[in-house]
UniProtKB/Swiss-Prot annotation:
It catalyses: thiamine + ATP = thiamine phosphate + ADP + H(+). Catalyzes the ATP-dependent phosphorylation of thiamine to thiamine phosphate. Is involved in thiamine salvage. Pathway: Cofactor biosynthesis; thiamine diphosphate biosynthesis; thiamine phosphate from thiamine: step 1/1. Pfam families: APH (PF01636). Belongs to the thiamine kinase family. HAMAP family: Thiamine_kinase. It comes from Salmonella paratyphi A (strain AKU_12601). Coiled coil: none annotated. This is Thiamine kinase.
Length: 274
């Protein structure tokens, strides 16, 4: 279902106009952010998501909806409704664990995603990193950040090993163990890109866990494990800068202390590695 209304509506207007029998049930839950909430009618639940990034064009939010509309139920929740500024998404019943699944299970899930048809838009990190620099708190801009940014821009993004649709925000809180298996939620950063970029961006605990995931994926995808790991390492500087920039970006938007702490820790990691 899609609305033709061109003006963003408030949450209460969305509920009264399109979901009159539903009431807010849970807010700020796992996998939800920026004013999104769960609405319920009796035992039936729906996730109501709001376009919460003022610096992102509306087209980015529409892409999120299109990605969910395109993906099979074996990977993601169904998209149910869209109007400018809002979408409604199927609520997945299951268990969310902050820890990642074991390497074989996660590799199978990601390989299944990467076998799907392309979304139709590419993930480009260089302009995204530049946006994070320009939109961050000016007091947080450092010569070190600028040097690293310019070095990456000079080198250019690695040549893709294999293009596929990517999720790009894989961590424990975005994986739901349902009765039918693992599913991914929170697809707002999805797009087409290198499979090694996806694997580089997974929020792993340490290099050992990362290597286990890479090896499990290589076996499933029939890719040389050493070649895949080399490609993942080529993407690593980009991913670390992406995370640092995103934390800075969210700090400027929200003022929440967790983001500044995460940004500081990521910058420390970058400085230690030179």
């Amino acid at each position: 279902m899609r609305s033709n209304n061109n003006n963003p509506l408030t949450r209460d207007e969305i509920l009264s106009r399109y979901f009159p029998q539903y009431r807010p049930a849970v807010t700020a839950s796992q996998g939800l952010s920026g004013g999104s909430c769960i609405i319920a009618h009796d035992t039936h639940r729906i996730v109501l998501r709001r376009h919460h990034d003022p610096d992102a064009p509306p087209a980015h939010f529409l892409r999120h909806h299109r990605a969910l509309s395109q993906l099979p139920a074996s990977l993601a929740p169904r998209a149910l409704f869209y109007t400018p500024g809002w979408m409604a998404v199927e609520y997945l019943h299951g268990v969310v664990n902050s820890a990642l699944p074991d390497a074989d299970e996660l590799a199978a899930l990601l390989y299944h995603l990467h076998q799907q048809p392309h979304f139709g838009w590419r993930i480009a990190l260089s302009p995204l990193l530049a946006q994070y620099w320009s939109c961050c708190d000016p007091a947080r801009r450092t010569p070190f950040w600028l040097r690293r940014l310019k070095q990456l821009q000079k080198n250019g993004e690695p040549r893709p090993l294999r293009l596929a649709p990517l999720h790009m925000d894989v961590h424990g809180d975005n994986i739901v163990l349902t009765s039918a298996g693992l599913r991914l939620i929170d697809w707002e950063y999805a797009g087409d890109g290198d499979i090694a970029l996806e694997l580089a961006a997974v929020w792993v605990e340490d290099e050992r866990q990362h290597r286990q995931l890479a090896d499990a994926y290589a076996a499933r995808a029939r890719i040389d494990a050493r070649q895949l790991w080399r490609q993942i390492r080529l993407w690593h500087p980009w991913v670390i800068m992406l995370k640092a920039g995103w934390f800075e970006y969210r700090w400027r938007q929200t003022g929440e202390q967790q983001f500044i702490r995460l940004a500081d820790e990521t910058w420390r990691q970058l400085r230690m590695k030179g």
